[in-house]
Amino acid sequence: MRILYAASEATPFAKSGGLADVAGSLPKALVRDGVDARVIMPLYGDIQIRDQLTYVTNYSVPVGWRSQYCGLFRAQWDGVTYYFLDNEYYFKRRGLYGFYDDGERFAFFSRAVLETLFYLDFTPDIINCNDWQTALVPVYLNLYYRHLDKFNRIKTIFTIHNIAYQGKYGLDILEDTCGIGRRDQHIVEYDGCANFMKGAFETADKITTVSPTYAQEILDPWFSYGLDALLREKQYKLCGILNGIDMDANNPATDPSIPYNYSIANFREGKAACKAALQDQFGLHKDGSPVFAIVSRMVGMKGFDLVQSIADGLVDLGIELVILGSGESQYEGFFSDLAARRPGRVGTYIGFNSALAQQIYAGADCFLMPSKSEPCGLAQMVACRYGTPPIVRETGGLRDSIQDSTKGHGNGFTFAGYSAHELYDACCRANAAYYDKENWEHLVEYAMNCDFSWSVSAKSYEGLYNETANLW
């Protein structure tokens, strides 16, 4: 089985969100299983391994009425072959997205993915495209390449990491920039706009999301950002596969960022030492209180409005809070002020610090993740890995990965409705459970034993790839 994984970002080369983690981990897990999985992505200006790249060739890529240069470079990393597509006009910029011509940039990239195959001795069985930045790959394949021998058996899978970002532009972009004539514009047109993601829904052989629950949620108008009717029509080719995490990078036994390494065998001593160090760092009291933590972007979608509503109530219960993140000014201001008002009980760090994030995973007792919507989420899995039971809302991948321990065997605490009352109730249950030390230690051990490795998810993808390759 030959897989070409097309993504606009991949760790460790370029990252703005969870897509990069998936693109950096899933192909590696597939290769370990004997799949010939390769990654293709843009060569951004910030990529640091240019001295390790091998130049392959260069060629022209159609972009509307003109052609643009594309350079092809190759590298091996962790056993995976990476192809980097170079065009300094489009990709040598500070940052990955947010430019006025993003539609043109990723129309070029999508077309270049297919043009690149003419210059490789590698023809994939499946091209796995990801999010709107590669959504035009199956569109272009069906319109301009399917009749060619090299392409006529290639199948496509489109993975939705977050349906909120669809690649929506004015209709004038289609012919002039994307090179899609008026006869075919209906494939990409939706609700009076050019919608790249809609084009992938129409033309890809399969559609996946990053968790089974999210695959069901996006059929509902509340979660779909306007695409629910189309997705219900395409439901026959939609499925959800839960993401995994890199178990080596997130390993409390070897993590150099934390003050005391530990495993299931000695988590009591390890967690206690990491908690004490975390409390010292944030000036919190060491009085036996549980520490509840958040590591997240400070936006409403992550449930910060709920946390804001109950924060003082949690502190009054005797819970200490640690918050790491940045985002909307109203939340940055509130939690900074909360730390000032409740010294010794609340610690806030505005910004992001990866080492500190790992220290929080290791040192906290519970991890808060009350998201309004969460396609998959990785933080709750990392928290389990470090023996920090999560408190999550039952949505998307949170529902698929965390089971409520108060209902029997579970690895955390859950609540269903998006309300401050239900979050507060879940926190109270967690707080009460914390003081039952024997059962709490069983919960921590159970959470640490959960297998969220990519090897599990890779098996599901391999099944999907085989099924898709055998279509017609």
Regions found by a protein language model. Give the residues of each.
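Catalytic cores of nucleotide-sugar-dependent glycosyltransferases that transfer UDP/GDP/TDP-activated
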Residues: M1-W472
